């Protein structure tokens, strides 16, 4: 029977927590700003860790600048995290921008716009939901006479 949580997954979760703390408390680089660590994928041999991050910025150039600053600081961040974790070999950290949060917000906004548009059209033209029982009775009467 396989373990419910593999060692790489547990290390990834701990690495995510430690990275979040280090990025929030120990990094003083103003180029980075506020960073959210969404997920960490650790390779099976524990040599690499792909760190998915997001920023509270929508401008692609600003996001790329922040990501480049993180990539440049990766060896220093790795050293800080290695001091906090009890691993024989600390994985090499590779930062990747996670656009899923931004895409999810964009999709949510699109759905909200469509819902608001539908509500406006229903108010303007009426809807099938506005049919009363009198309308149904009148329709039945006209069908019976024909």
UniProtKB/Swiss-Prot annotation:
Keywords on record: Cytoplasm, Ribosome biogenesis
GO molecular function terms listed in the Swiss-Prot or TrEMBL record: ribosomal small subunit binding
Primary residence: cytoplasm
Domain of life: Bacteria
Single GO biological process annotation from the record: maturation of SSU-rRNA
A Pfam family matched in the record: RBFA
Function: One of several proteins that assist in the late maturation steps of the functional core of the 30S ribosomal subunit. Associates with free 30S ribosomal subunits (but not with 30S subunits that are part of 70S ribosomes or polysomes). Required for efficient processing of 16S rRNA. May interact with the 5'-terminal helix region of 16S rRNA.
Subunit annotation: Monomer. Binds 30S ribosomal subunits, but not 50S ribosomal subunits or 70S ribosomes.
Protein's UniProt name: Ribosome-binding factor A
């Amino acid at each position: 029977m396989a373990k419910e949580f593999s060692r790489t997954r547990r290390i990834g979760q701990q690495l995510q927590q430690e990275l979040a703390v280090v990025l929030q408390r120990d990094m003083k680089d103003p180029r980075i700003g506020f960073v959210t660590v969404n997920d960490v994928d650790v390779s099976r041999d524990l040599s690499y860790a792909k760190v998915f991050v997001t920023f509270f910025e929508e401008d692609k150039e600003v996001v790329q600048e922040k990501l480049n600053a993180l990539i440049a600081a990766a060896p220093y961040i790795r050293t800080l995290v290695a001091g906090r974790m009890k691993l024989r070999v600390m994985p090499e950290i590779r930062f990747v921008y996670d656009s899923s949060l931004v895409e999810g917000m964009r999709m949510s906004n699109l759905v909200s716009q469509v819902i608001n548009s539908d509500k406006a059209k229903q108010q303007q033209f009426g809807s099938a939901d506005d049919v009363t029982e009198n309308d149904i009775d009148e329709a039945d009467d006209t069908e019976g006479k024909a």
